[in-house]
Amino acid sequence: MAQGQVQVHFSTTSPDIELPEGKQQLLVPTNVRRYGLSQILNSEAMLDTSSPIPFDFLINGTFLRTTLDEYLTANGLSSETTLNLQYVRSLIPPLYEASFEHDDWVSSVDVLSGSSAAGAWGKNSIVEGQERILSGSYDGLLRVWNKSGQAIATSAPASIGGHTSGVKAAKWLSARQVASAGLDRTIRIWNYSESEDHFSAQLKPTMELYGHTGSIDSIAVHGPSNRILSASADGQIGFWTSHKSSAPEVNTSLISGPSTKRRKITTSTSTPQRGPLSLMDCHNGPATAVIFNPQDPTVAYSASQDHTIKTLDITTSSIVDTRTLLNPILSLSALPGIGHQIIAAGTTARHIALIDPRASAATTQAMTLRGHTNFVSSIFADPDSNYGLVSAGHDGTCRVWDLRSTRQGTKDEGLGVVGEAVYIIERESRKDKTTKTVGGEGVKVFDVNWDKDVGIVSAGEDKMVQVNRGRGVTRPEN
């Protein structure tokens, strides 16, 4: 029985591995899979590579995981069809690298490196090997780690200027400054300095910001303007400065309770206290996430358990657009998108909604990413790719997504375009356990960050910061 064949057209977005136009069309066997197609591309008659390059193939935005014949059958196509195969270098698994243990749940992580936003904002370049990981914990402390897993700095306790309750968010403002916020309803600014040998460091409290009446669950920072945004359980979005001289006076009625008593006892601590530049009444429920527009720091996006995403004009402290989803929203991230920006929103319904925030957009939701089995608590864009992102969930996993890998949704999924994870990162702390967790119990992941130099860094209920390889996961390494 003769082997079937099908005409294919090879294309790529990577100029360094693009075929000459005369070699882009080829008749290939229908029983071939990804590996066979990769061999064809590497052959002397095609790319003639000096050493084989593993390739993945996309057809209509979906990675090929079967034979071509099985793909044709599943999609009701005949072998007379010309298949357009987009080839990309194969993805590299996000292999486990290290874990850093804490005394309590870890709620927040951020990375300082030569490629991170804070590293780029600062005047001092970050030397390779001196990257730092910032973590915030429910024990009320911040810690700064080197890549070897040593905590080289720990923030002051409550008695001498630290948080009086759990930390929910922490960010590098620059290589010399950190912002944090949490259950004590305050934002705190810290100066960060290292010893000459870089084996030890210090976090010194320099300012306390008061204004919210509920827990602060998310902050965003813009180092060049010294601006900070906050999302609080009181439904408000706060706008702040890290410059003491520019910050308004504090409303003293907000400084009450245990922190005041501690101040009276510890007279040697005199951290300046300031108020917000503005507080915006944005949401009818707890505000859960806030981010700056990466291209325009006068624009921000906020999300809430009231099901809405708001586009904010920070200059006028006004709401310019509202998008309403079907479920409460817990996390946000801005993605470069293809030609325009996309907002990824993690929900309590276990999926990620991709939103076009432009007022002219015809539809609210451009795509849905499905796979998590519990709340989606954090999202971070791939620093190397327009197509990639990683999400953290209360199911105890981080999931890596490639927006080029899609399928048509079922009726139960509400139709539309659906994306599925290309990799699932489990918590390493569970690897030696024989009992299964239910819904992520004990290993919920609360935050995730994706840094080009350090990798995929996640934090969770297992009291660990976990580091996984991050380069080449959704695109080739440089």
Swiss-Prot record:
<feature type="repeat" description="WD 1">
    <location>
        <begin position="111"/>
        <end position="155"/>
    </location>
</feature>
<dbReference type="GO" id="GO:0110136">
    <property type="term" value="P:protein-RNA complex remodeling"/>
</dbReference>
<dbReference type="InterPro" id="IPR001680">
    <property type="entry name" value="WD40_rpt"/>
</dbReference>
<dbReference type="GO" id="GO:0000463">
    <property type="term" value="P:maturation of LSU-rRNA from tricistronic rRNA transcript (SSU-rRNA, 5.8S rRNA, LSU-rRNA)"/>
</dbReference>
<dbReference type="GO" id="GO:0005654">
    <property type="term" value="C:nucleoplasm"/>
</dbReference>
<feature type="region of interest" description="Disordered">
    <location>
        <begin position="250"/>
        <end position="276"/>
    </location>
</feature>
<feature type="repeat" description="WD 4">
    <location>
        <begin position="282"/>
        <end position="322"/>
    </location>
</feature>
<feature type="repeat" description="WD 2">
    <location>
        <begin position="162"/>
        <end position="200"/>
    </location>
</feature>
<protein>
    <recommendedName>
        <fullName>Ribosome biogenesis protein ytm1</fullName>
    </recommendedName>
</protein>
<dbReference type="InterPro" id="IPR036322">
    <property type="entry name" value="WD40_repeat_dom_sf"/>
</dbReference>
<dbReference type="InterPro" id="IPR015943">
    <property type="entry name" value="WD40/YVTN_repeat-like_dom_sf"/>
</dbReference>
<keyword id="KW-0539">Nucleus</keyword>
<dbReference type="InterPro" id="IPR019775">
    <property type="entry name" value="WD40_repeat_CS"/>
</dbReference>
<dbReference type="InterPro" id="IPR020472">
    <property type="entry name" value="G-protein_beta_WD-40_rep"/>
</dbReference>
<keyword id="KW-0677">Repeat</keyword>
<dbReference type="Pfam" id="PF08154">
    <property type="entry name" value="NLE"/>
</dbReference>
<feature type="repeat" description="WD 6">
    <location>
        <begin position="440"/>
        <end position="478"/>
    </location>
</feature>
<keyword id="KW-0853">WD repeat</keyword>
<feature type="repeat" description="WD 3">
    <location>
        <begin position="211"/>
        <end position="250"/>
    </location>
</feature>
<dbReference type="GO" id="GO:0030687">
    <property type="term" value="C:preribosome, large subunit precursor"/>
</dbReference>
<feature type="region of interest" description="Ubiquitin-like (UBL) domain">
    <location>
        <begin position="6"/>
        <end position="89"/>
    </location>
</feature>
<dbReference type="InterPro" id="IPR028599">
    <property type="entry name" value="WDR12/Ytm1"/>
</dbReference>
<feature type="repeat" description="WD 5">
    <location>
        <begin position="371"/>
        <end position="411"/>
    </location>
</feature>
<comment type="similarity">
    <text>Belongs to the WD repeat WDR12/YTM1 family.</text>
</comment>
<comment type="function">
    <text>Component of the NOP7 complex, which is required for maturation of the 25S and 5.8S ribosomal RNAs and formation of the 60S ribosome.</text>
</comment>
<comment type="subunit">
    <text>Component of the NOP7 complex, composed of erb1, nop7 and ytm1. The complex is held together by erb1, which interacts with nop7 via its N-terminal domain and with ytm1 via a high-affinity interaction between the seven-bladed beta-propeller domains of the 2 proteins. The NOP7 complex associates with the 66S pre-ribosome. Interacts (via UBL domain) with MDN1 (via VWFA/MIDAS domain).</text>
</comment>
<dbReference type="Pfam" id="PF00400">
    <property type="entry name" value="WD40"/>
</dbReference>
<dbReference type="GO" id="GO:0000466">
    <property type="term" value="P:maturation of 5.8S rRNA from tricistronic rRNA transcript (SSU-rRNA, 5.8S rRNA, LSU-rRNA)"/>
</dbReference>
<dbReference type="GO" id="GO:0070545">
    <property type="term" value="C:PeBoW complex"/>
</dbReference>
<dbReference type="InterPro" id="IPR012972">
    <property type="entry name" value="NLE"/>
</dbReference>
<dbReference type="GO" id="GO:0043021">
    <property type="term" value="F:ribonucleoprotein complex binding"/>
</dbReference>
<keyword id="KW-0698">rRNA processing</keyword>
<keyword id="KW-0690">Ribosome biogenesis</keyword>
<dbReference type="GO" id="GO:0051276">
    <property type="term" value="P:chromosome organization"/>
</dbReference>
